[in-house]
């Protein structure tokens, strides 16, 4: 990494040291367990600034024996999705869409790359995410690349702090498919989490 890049990253990293650990209880994690029924896969989400194309955030959707979202140093959360140190359990299709909707807005697109993998590789990625621990701010790209690097079939993923570099390498993997998510929501998305939580409760009340 160039010295100029390190000079930009290190002050942020040092200021953010001591990531907040979160540990949902066993019963919540067990209750939230979601099996998608889809072939195993790993999906990389990159939040990209529309003006300039800078990668601002990385997250991993791992579809293994259960479907989880590794959202390192992320700010998305939902009351129905228990979290353990940046790993979110119970990622149903609705929650996956909530995650995308939270990040995509008038100033950011969400770029999705999905790669099919064997059940063994998916499970290996899940175990790595479970054991990774809480991630400091500005280390999302670094933690995602840490998890991917060395997985069978992902050897070309570099260890890097930069989400765009992870995305560019991921895009070159065999079988990778791409989708871009656009949204015109205002840049201030502080109310999105409240709306998502409220809409889920309303659906539950209707079903009951």
Give the positions of each predicted feature.
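C-terminal motif of bacterial Sec signal peptides marking the signal peptidase cleavage site
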Residues: 13-16
């Amino acid at each position: 990494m160039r010295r100029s890049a390190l000079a930009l990253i290190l002050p942020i990293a040092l200021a953010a040291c001591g990531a907040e650990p979160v540990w949902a209880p066993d019963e919540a994690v067990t209750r939230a367990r979601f099996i998608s029924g889809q072939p195993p896969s790993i999906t990389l989400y990159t939040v990209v600034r529309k003006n300039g194309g800078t990668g601002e955030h990385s997250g991993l959707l791992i579809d293994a024996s259960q479907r989880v979202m590794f959202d390192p140093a992320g700010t998305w959360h939902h009351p129905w999705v228990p979290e353990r140190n940046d790993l979110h359990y119970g990622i149903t299709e609705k929650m996956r869409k909530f995650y995308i909707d939270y990040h995509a807005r008038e100033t950011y697109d969400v770029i999705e790359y999905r790669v099919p993998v064997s059940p063994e590789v998916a499970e290996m990625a899940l175990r790595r995410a479970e054991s990774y621990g809480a991630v400091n701010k500005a280390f999302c790209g670094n933690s995602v690349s840490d998890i991917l690097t060395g997985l069978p079939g992902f050897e070309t993923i570099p260890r890097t702090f930069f989400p765009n570099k992870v995305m560019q390498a991921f895009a070159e993997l065999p079988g990778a498919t791409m989708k871009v998510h656009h949204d015109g929501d205002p840049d201030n998305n502080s109310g999105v989490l409240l709306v998502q939580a409220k809409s889920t409760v309303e659906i539950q009340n209707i079903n009951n």
